[in-house]
Structures are given as C-alpha cells and as structure tokens.
A protein has these predicted regions:
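A short, charged/proline- and glycine-enriched loop
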Residues: 68-81, 104-105
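Phosphate/oxyanion-binding loops and surfaces in catalytic or ligand/nucleic-acid-binding neighborhoods
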Residues: 4, 19, 46-50, 174
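C-terminal, non-catalytic tails of nucleotide-sugar-dependent glycosyltransferases
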Residues: 8, 28-74
Length: 185
C-alpha cells in the first residue's frame, strides 16, 4: 500500500492477541505448522527490500522499530500533566506544540510528570500518533527511562520551571538532545 503511494493509517488503541501454538501446536516438523518454515523464507524473500531499508533486525532498537521512526528525529515533551486544551492556556500551548511537532514529521513522546492517565485527553494524543507515558510502572523512573532511551532523543522540551528543575539533570546526563524550555506565564 505504501509502495503504491497510499496513506497507511493505524489504530493506536488496537490490540493484537496471539496464543502461540493454540490452533496447530508448536511442532514445525509436521502438520500445518510444517509450512511455517518454508513460508517464513518466502516472506523474507518477497519483502527483502522493505525489510532491509525500513525495518531494523529483530530485537535491534525496539524504541525506534516499534513505531517505524528509524528515519525520524524524536522529541520528548515533559509537562506537569496531560494537557487539557479546553481548560487552561498552558495546556492549550503544549497541545499545539505537540500537534505541530507531529506535523513537522517528528516522532513525539509525552511524559506527564504526574504520570496520570487522563482518560479523555491521553486517548486524543494517542490518536494523533503521540506516545504518552503514564502509570505506576514509570513512577520514580524518569532518570532510568532517560538513561535507557536517551540515545534515541534528539530534542527534549521541558515545560514550566518546577518540571524542568525536576527533569533537567537526567536529560543532560544521559542524552545529547537539544534541550528546549517553555516557561508559560
């Protein structure tokens, strides 16, 4: 579809569930599964050009591979919470920044300092193709996350003085990203 010049859309809220071996077992030496090995070779042969230019090898840099951002610059935006653009001017500003960064072709990540999943606005950002980090699994782990993924960040926008103060040191220590600051008021 892409090769034909068509737009490809995906649904960020979609879920793929796969139970390996439930339908036909796991033995590739017999039965229907015996075709799996041959079909895998045919698949790689058919899609070799695409896999070689637009994809990374298996398990190489999943941060970039999972959202096909191999050839894009990545920006991480950090603000105090998921913006609510119809409720306050600061949120409106950040919302516009996020959408504009996406329109510029950047791979956009958003880290709300409070890590709260706003059921309305988080989903809207995700529908725009913006990855939003939230939940207990990230609590107290910003520095660790930046240490692990900092090499993939080209820009970091820190919003508001108290947010910048809390997040600047790990960004400087673990990335070569250009740091931007937006102070609001």
């Amino acid at each position: 579809v892409r090769a034909a010049g068509k737009r490809v859309l995906y649904q960020p809220a979609s879920v793929v569930i796969h139970y390996e071996g439930i339908s036909h077992g796991t033995d590739t030496g017999s039965g229907v599964k015996a075709h799996q090995v041959d079909n895998q070779k045919k698949f790689y042969k058919r899609w070799a050009d695409e896999l070689g230019t637009r994809h990374l090898d298996n398990a190489v840099n999943p941060f970039r591979a999972r959202d096909r951002s191999i050839h894009q610059k990545t920006i991480l935006v950090v603000d105090h919470y998921v913006p609510q653009p119809d409720r306050d001017a600061g949120s409106r500003s950040i919302w516009c920044f996020l959408r504009e960064f996406k329109a510029m072709g950047l791979n956009v990540k958003f880290w709300p300092a409070n890590l709260w999943h706003d059921p309305q606005y988080t989903a809207l950002l995700q529908q725009e193709g913006i990855e939003v980090y939230y939940g207990n699994e990230y609590a107290g782990r910003f520095a660790e996350w930046v240490q692990e993924h900092g090499a993939n960040l080209d820009y970091v926008l820190l919003s508001r003085p108290h947010v910048a103060q809390e997040h600047l040191d790990p960004v400087r220590a673990h990335t070569r990203a250009k740091v931007l600051f937006y102070g609001h008021d």
